[in-house]
C-alpha cells in the first residue's frame, strides 16, 4: 500500500462498510451524493439512483452525512507529519 493511502483507504472502506451517505465535492464545485459502493487507487464508485465512477483526481472533499468510526477498521495510529507538528500548540503561555 502506498504511503499516501494509509488514511484514505480505511476512511473510504469504513464509509463503504457502514453504508454512510456521503457528499462528494469535485474540484469544479459540483456536489455528488450517494454511498461508496467500491473504490480503488484511482476511482470511487458512488451509488445513488445510478452508479457513478468518480475519478479521485477530480475530488476536492468527501463529507460523511453522519458520524462513523474509522478506527474500528484501522488500528494503526496516524503518523506524525514531517516537521513533527502534532496539532498542539508548542508555544508556552506567560
UniProtKB/Swiss-Prot annotation:
Disulfide pattern: none
InterPro entries in the cross-refs: Hfq (IPR005001), LSM_dom_sf (IPR010920), Sm (IPR047575)
PROSITE patterns: SM
Region (Disordered): 70-94
A cellular-component GO term for this protein: cytosol
Any single GO BP term: regulation of translation, ncRNA-mediated
One GO MF term: RNA binding
Pfam families per the UniProt record, alphabetical: Hfq
Domain Sm: from-to ranges: 9-68
Keywords, comma-separated and alphabetical: RNA-binding, Stress response
Sequence similarity: Belongs to the Hfq family.
Assembly, per entry: Homohexamer.
Its job: RNA chaperone that binds small regulatory RNA (sRNAs) and mRNAs to facilitate mRNA translational regulation in response to envelope stress, environmental stress and changes in metabolite concentrations. Also binds with high specificity to tRNAs.
Protein name: RNA-binding protein Hfq
Organism per entry: Shewanella woodyi (strain ATCC 51908 / MS32)
The encoding gene: hfq
Amino acid at each position: 500500500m502506498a504511503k499516501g493511502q494509509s488514511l484514505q483507504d480505511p476512511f473510504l472502506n469504513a464509509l463503504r462498510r457502514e453504508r454512510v451517505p456521503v457528499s462528494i465535492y469535485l474540484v469544479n464545485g459540483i456536489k455528488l451524493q450517494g454511498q461508496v459502493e467500491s473504490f480503488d487507487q484511482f476511482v470511487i464508485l458512488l451509488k445513488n439512483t445510478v452508479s457513478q465512477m468518480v475519478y479521485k483526481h477530480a475530488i476536492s472533499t468527501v463529507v460523511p452525512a453522519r458520524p462513523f468510526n474509522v478506527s474500528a477498521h484501522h488500528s494503526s495510529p496516524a503518523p506524525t507529519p514531517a516537521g513533527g507538528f502534532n496539532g498542539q500548540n508548542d508555544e508556552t503561555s506567560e
